[in-house]
């Protein structure tokens, strides 16, 4: 693993002020507001990437996060204490489009515009393997959280592929008519949700390679999908400038669309802006091309509009154990901030 030198101060976290639009209260170091996390300070901005940051995700323990983007590198960061970029993973020949952690936090997986998936040992920084098989940009990646650690990926080549993380070879391919841009795998590993440029979200049953349902409502490209913690709801984002929740429980009613959230927008960059559930699934978050992070209650109320970035916010993630939100941007920076 490449390590940052101590002199590279630009990779450290810096205290910043961030305004909650709902009540315009400042959250600053020494604020009288009750602290809600173990962060050293309520809000930090991290520097280190040399190009647009497209994705950032916490590891399952919540002690670390990884970020990647157009500079073809994955940066590894501490969350608590003196927040620093402690390692750099190199090897992809194209932009890092998505990344995931293994459930034991020892492996980092990524998808890339170079048509491959890659995995690294997050402790040693050693490359583990490269997964080859896609014939176009790999836009998104998800990992099964229980049982065998399966990977799912979708690509501009109009296919969704399933991989055994222990092998280089693809174990299943599903072909669609249009390029695919988003994927999420159900907790039990029998269903995969995929979205593409046609605006439809399809539920594929991996046991019989059958599309069991199509979730309709979006009118433009699906940019991100995420399953709720209990597996009952699917969160989606689209270039139609809406974020939606769908009921994906077995034998759900015909009207599966539960919520529509508005506010977050997609701009001329046409980046695949991400969405995320909070740790208790009470809140959802999304990036926006207007440089803000949007957070809603799952019941539909807009709770926060968080400024600070100077470019499109491409991805957000919630901490698995504390009230902390992570965001990354085309401005090459990353924010860590607590929610109160």
Swiss-Prot record:
* Alphabetical list of PROSITE patterns matching this protein: WD_REPEATS_1, WD_REPEATS_2, WD_REPEATS_REGION
Q: Name one GO cellular component term.
A: spliceosomal complex
Q: Which CDD domains match?
A: WD40 (cd00200)
UniProt repeat feature WD, residue ranges: 48-87, 91-130, 133-173, 175-214, 217-256, 267-306, 308-339
- Where does this polypeptide localize? Nucleus
Q: What does the UniProt keyword field contain?
A: mRNA processing, mRNA splicing, Nucleus, Repeat, WD repeat
Which BP terms does GO give this entry?
mRNA cis splicing, via spliceosome
Assign the protein's first listed, main location to one coarse class: nucleus
Describe its partners and assembly state.
Belongs to the 40S cdc5-associated complex (or cwf complex), a spliceosome sub-complex reminiscent of a late-stage spliceosome composed of the U2, U5 and U6 snRNAs and at least brr2, cdc5, cwf2/prp3, cwf3/syf1, cwf4/syf3, cwf5/ecm2, spp42/cwf6, cwf7/spf27, cwf8, cwf9, cwf10, cwf11, cwf12, prp45/cwf13, cwf14, cwf15, cwf16, cwf17, cwf18, cwf19, cwf20, cwf21, cwf22, cwf23, cwf24, cwf25, cwf26, cyp7/cwf27, cwf28, cwf29/ist3, lea1, msl1, prp5/cwf1, prp10, prp12/sap130, prp17, prp22, sap61, sap62, sap114, sap145, slu7, smb1, smd1, smd3, smf1, smg1 and syf2.
The protein's job, in short, is: Involved in mRNA splicing where it associates with cdc5 and the other cwf proteins as part of the spliceosome.
State the PANTHER family in the record.
U5 SMALL NUCLEAR RIBONUCLEOPROTEIN 40 KDA PROTEIN (PTHR44006:SF1)
Q: What is this protein called?
A: Pre-mRNA-splicing factor cwf17
Organism, per UniProt?
Schizosaccharomyces pombe (strain 972 / ATCC 24843) (Fission yeast)
